[in-house]
Amino acid sequence: MSEKVVLAYSGGLDTSAAVKWLQEKYGMDVIAVTIDVGNEKDFTLIKEKALKVGAKKAYVRDVRKEFAEDYIWKAIKANSMYEGVYPLATALARPLIAKVMVDIAMEEGATAIAHGCTGKGNDQVRFDVGINTLAPHLKIIAPARQWGMTREQTMEYAQKWGIPVPISVKNPFSIDENLWGRSIECGLLEDPWNEPIPEVFAWTRPVEATPDAPEYLEVEFEQGVPVAVNGEKLSPLALIQKVHDIAGLHGVGRIDHVENRLVGIKSREIYEAPAAVVLIAAHQALEAMTLSKSQLRFKQMVEATYSDIIYNGLWFSALRQDLDAFIESSQRFVSGTVRLKLSKGSFRVVGRKSPYSLYHKGMATYDKGDQFDPSSAVGFITLWGLQAKLQAQLQPILEEEKGNKS
């Protein structure tokens, strides 16, 4: 009896070709697994295609709710933005996909897991590290990393075996999408000087096609988790979709970024993430009101590390769990509502309120009702500047700090 390999199957070029290649190269029975993390795809057709191209069995697993509650919500609490720009949509989904693949491999008694990642991308690291962490006994096969074919040659290989492919040499964009965002690469986008053509975008309107009137959006949070939009309590999936639709209508969420990949190269990436950029910005605004200065400063360091952990494929690491403990604690009082104004491809926070706000109007105002005692400032300034004053008296100041008198 042939050994079984569980293949992460998207229905695209690489994984469709991989079904036949795995059978040819290893003589294995291929079990295709397609994971729904919010992809806008016809999963019935993908399952049928997997069987048609030679898979012995095909699974479709809907994990959207788990993705939102156990991954996206954590990313919001951590304000996760790789290099301050990318909200990590693809990177966030990979550990969940790896987990489901391992679960099915165990159920099926498979000896290997295969994926369609190339040798240049980050996803190969995310899948391999995740699988090795969860099930080190399983063999990992990456056909696109091993077969040595160019994209055009892969198309020819697929056509040779009668495998339909959804792309052409003239329009060779590689697209990945889920609840949290959409990434587009390859083709003309590989030249960072080229402006993305309109066909690259699917979720966000071009500025010239957005409404002339701005739109206000209110997002309510409970302990760091978004729970309502414009006063309406929504499920996680419905809430993300609601913000996605409103932000996309106004052209919000386009990202054009030259990114430092984990494998050591720079890559030009185009992203659409309307819900992600709006919800993270709203969350940051609420934190600015409810966390102390020292909490915010320390959390910013944690956020950078947390984002790197996600990007670098270390979701299942002990460090991520440790940082989660701090982040969860920091969200105890991050409850309230943030109002945003969206218009013509941009947005900004225009209001925020919280029962746990550390903003005290009586202390901040310069008008009637001022409760701040200005006489307290004198003693504070004396003590605050004492060390700098003493050091200047006891140690010579560098000449360049004094200014060149000659």
UniProtKB/Swiss-Prot annotation:
What residues bind ATP, as annotated?
8-16, 116
**CDD domains listed in its UniProt record:** ASS
Which reaction(s) are listed as its catalytic activity? Answer: L-citrulline + L-aspartate + ATP = 2-(N(omega)-L-arginino)succinate + AMP + diphosphate + H(+)
**Enzyme Commission no:** 6.3.4.5
| UniProtKB keywords | Amino-acid biosynthesis, Arginine biosynthesis, ATP-binding, Cytoplasm, Ligase, Nucleotide-binding
Recorded metabolic or biological pathway in which this protein acts: Amino-acid biosynthesis; L-arginine biosynthesis; L-arginine from L-ornithine and carbamoyl phosphate: step 2/3
Q: Which GO terms describe its molecular function?
A: argininosuccinate synthase activity; ATP binding
SUPFAM superfamilies (UniProt xref)? Adenine nucleotide alpha hydrolases-like, Argininosuccinate synthetase, C-terminal domain
Cellular-component GO terms for this entry? cytoplasm
For binding L-citrulline, which residues are annotated in this chain's numbering?
Answer: 86, 122, 126, 174, 183, 259, 271
Pfam family, any one: Arginosuc_syn_C
Question: Where in the cell does this protein reside?
Answer: Cytoplasm
Q: Which cysteines are joined by disulfide bonds?
A: none
Instruction: Kindly list the positions annotated as binding L-aspartate.
Output: 118, 122-123
The UniProt entry's GO biological process terms, in alphabetical order, are: argininosuccinate metabolic process; L-arginine biosynthetic process; urea cycle
Primary site of residence: cytoplasm
Q: Which family does it belong to?
A: Belongs to the argininosuccinate synthase family. Type 1 subfamily.
- Complex and partners: Homotetramer.
NCBIfam families xref list = argG, PRK00509.1
What name is this protein filed under? Argininosuccinate synthase
